[in-house]
Amino acid sequence: MSAFPASPQPSAFPASPQPSAFPASPQPSASPVSPRHCVSPSSGTLPSSSSPSVSSCALRGLSSSSSALSRPPFSSFPASPAFSRRCMLTESEMGKTRSLKWLRFRCILGACLLHFCLGGSHTIGNLLPYLIGFIRNAQATSAVSYKDGLSIYAWAIICQGVGGFLGTTLEKKAGTKKTAFLGSAWMTLGLALCGVCTHDLSLFLIAYGVVTALGCGVAYPVPLAATLKLSPAEDKGWVSGLLFFARGLSVCILCPFQSFFLHQPPEVFLSLIPAPLLPYLSSVASDTASASRLSSLNGKRAAPLPSPGGERFLTDQAVLDRLPALFFVMAGVFACIQLLGVLLLVDPERTSAADEAAADAAERQKLLYEDPQGASRASAGRSSSCSASQVFASLVLTPQDICSSPSFWRLFLMLLLSWQSLFFVQLFWKVLPLYPEASLAASAAAPAPLDSLFASVVRRVPRALASASRPDPRALHAAADAWSLTGSSWSFANDFFLSCLGGLLGALCCFGRLLWGYIGGGIGYMRSTVVMNALTAPCLFALSTYALQSPQLYAACLALVHVCHGGIFSLFPSVTSDLFGHKNVGPVFSLLFAARLAAVALAAIWINIALTYGNLHMVVGALGVCHLVSIGTTFFFHPTDALPYRFPTYSP
């Protein structure tokens, strides 16, 4: 006899199933079989009949509908241990997800607080008139002028770039929170030193342009990198935009705050009141109290003395003496905000975000190997839809490859030309009306004189209130600020008006980043750079002539320039991605950052020379030509120029 039992005979499975062989309801002793064993999940066919239980399951699927309806429901089957473990894992994963969301919220909030303080370094343009006036009064000399502020801001930008490199390197060794704390403390120390060194230009350059800027640079990339590591890929766009918004918000808040602190009530409120309304508002109080208050204000404020070059400087000693205290207050407030931001900041390496990312990668790899045909079909579809330039741009390039690419040097030239106007406008936006060219432009406008408006207001006031004993409001308002001496059309302008304008310009620059990103997605990023430069050039040409005829034209011109400058931050990274591929955006743009440093260093030199031996018209004219040259550079781009010379596809 054979050692193995005989195989079942074909007669055991008749051609047509008999009703008696398959009862209507299953026996209680029969073990339930999961429906997932009836059909193979991979092929969709019935499994092999080598197992009796599987064979009976397959045949029961062919039974009548009455037998299927008589089966017990799925809930009557006992829960398997694997199902219970899956439920426990699901609850654990939900807890981890909630914890990770809280960590992301903490990290984003802390990063926003840190970037809010870092944005305070861009308010040097608002403080430049006070700084130069304080140094001139302290040294009793007229050798210092507004063009000397170019070296301060240029050193600040260069040291911020160096500090960013140091911060990235230090983060890998010391961690996120320690690096952010070190940069924040260094920045706070620099602001405190600025309060001590305001009497000397060289010392202030070291305190603000080196110490404070290095602290800003060290602390700048750390919170941004931490939030991006904790955020999923679909949220990285709005998270980075939120941090940039926090930096712009600091300019909007700090510029009016600085003016408010330096002037202090009641001076700041009286300087806000237009000249025709001063007699009516002063008559509300007693005549003697109002007259004494206005006369004391008139005695404390003196008309700024013009320099040999025609520039006007602030000479109010009561206001200038508060400048060192302002830096001490800013250092104290920033120290508290930055300490809170560092405490809220989260180190991504100590969270489970990296583990979850690794698990997701392992899951994707598992799915790839389980369905290799689907993966190959997807990759084939992607490769068929990509153009040749996109395939070449997806290559990973080395620094030597990037520097040998003609497209890299064209982008370098465009950034070098565009950044010079941004550097000049961000520093000189408040002092341009104090140049003699502004007075000439305002006199050419010939607006309605102030006396006519003043007379119309006085006629509506009872004669008893318009006594001759009160001081002349026009003379009082003219002596209030140096900007009101620009011309009759600038008579209502004062420091607080210009400070509020600076806050608005900071908000418009942030809005410009979003606007040009949206425009670039519609018409293309390279075409958007052409439109952006075409709008910026005429505004710069008119900045020293027509724009200075009135504060309204000046504000409108600066607003358009700042909106266009916002496109520099959003369009050039996108252009870099289009030319070199998303894999090379980081290395290419890191090398392109040298164009920013070279631009501010070059602009600080030639603008200083142009203002010394020329005038303001030469400076803004040259800056407008830079944007026209940038437009011409865009027509020399070619998709294959992004490839280095070592690739055979690039050789002719």
UniProtKB/Swiss-Prot annotation:
Chief location bin: plastid
Record topological domains on the Cytoplasmic side: 1-45, 536-652
Positions of the UniProt region annotated as Disordered: 1-53
Keywords, ordered alphabetically: Apicoplast, Membrane, Plastid, Pyruvate, Transmembrane, Transmembrane helix, Transport
InterPro entries: MFS_Riboflavin_Transporter, MFS_trans_sf
One GO-annotated biological process of the protein: pyruvate transmembrane transport
Topological type in the membrane: Multi-pass membrane protein
Oligomeric and partner information: Interacts with apicoplast pyruvate carrier 1.
Protein task: Along with apicoplast pyruvate carrier 1, forms apicoplast pyruvate carrier (APC) complex, which transports pyruvate into the apicoplast and may also transport amino acids like methionine, serine, glycine and tryptophan with low efficiency. Required for maintaining pyruvate-dependent metabolic activities in the apicoplast, such as synthesis of fatty acids, isopentenyl pyrophosphate (IPP), dimethylallyl pyrophosphate (DMAPP) and methylerythritol 4-phosphate (MEP). Required for maintaining the integrity of the apicoplast. Required for normal parasite growth.
PANTHER family: RIBOFLAVIN TRANSPORTER RIBJ
Protein name stated in the entry: Apicoplast pyruvate carrier 2
Annotated organism of origin: Toxoplasma gondii
